[in-house]
């Protein structure tokens, strides 16, 4: 059953988001991101005195049609130093902002390591990183390590014939 959840911001503004009992906090953050343009990773939601954890359902948190959640937007204006480990096991430090895309980081890596962007891909904690996603969506922390993987190059077609 769908119902409207009231989301209140620190400045006093509020808005409604259509939700269901089985929806998770992560899904709610994605809907809020679509509605107000603040990326999910920058959102902190609270109900009464508890910070809402991403994997939990709204019903398990006791939220219902008359509930209001508080939205706090985390500032991401400070750069973050991360490591990118290449295929030889060497790591380089990169200054990034969580609001930048993976593609932006790939451009930096490409320039420093002299490897074309289409010849490698990046992963963090075993998860492939998509070019158009924001770095903040991956939960990067200061001094964390992103892995650079070389793409396999194709052969010449009918050489075995």
UniProtKB/Swiss-Prot annotation:
| Signal peptide start-end | none
Kindly state a single biological-process term from the GO annotations of this entry.
negative regulation of protein ubiquitination
For this UniProt record, give its keywords in alphabetical order, as a comma-separated list: Antiviral defense, Cytoplasm, Disulfide bond, Isopeptide bond, Repeat, S-nitrosylation, Secreted, Ubl conjugation pathway
* GO terms of molecular function: integrin binding; protein tag activity
Q: In chain numbering, where does the site feature Interacts with activating enzyme fall?
A: 151
Keyword Repeat among record annotations: yes
The keyword Oxidoreductase belongs to this UniProt entry's keyword annotation: no
> What InterPro entries does the entry give?
Ubiquilin, Ubiquitin-like_dom, Ubiquitin-like_domsf
Query: Where is the segment annotated Involved in the ligation of specific target proteins?
Result: 151-155
PTMs? S-nitrosylation decreases its dimerization, thereby increasing the availability as well as the solubility of monomeric ISG15 for its conjugation to cellular proteins.
Q: Record's Pfam families?
A: ubiquitin
Residue ranges of domain Ubiquitin-like in the record = 2-76, 77-155
Q: What is known of its domains?
A: Both the Ubiquitin-like 1 and Ubiquitin-like 2 domains are required for its efficient conjugation to cellular proteins. The two domains play different roles in the ISGylation pathway: Ubiquitin-like 2 domain is necessary for the first two steps allowing the linking of ISG15 to the E1 and E2 enzymes while Ubiquitin-like 1 domain is essential for the final, E3-mediated transfer of ISG15, from the E2 to the Lys of the target protein.
Q: What is this protein called?
A: Ubiquitin-like protein ISG15
Q: What is the lineage of its organism?
A: Eukaryota, Metazoa, Chordata, Craniata, Vertebrata
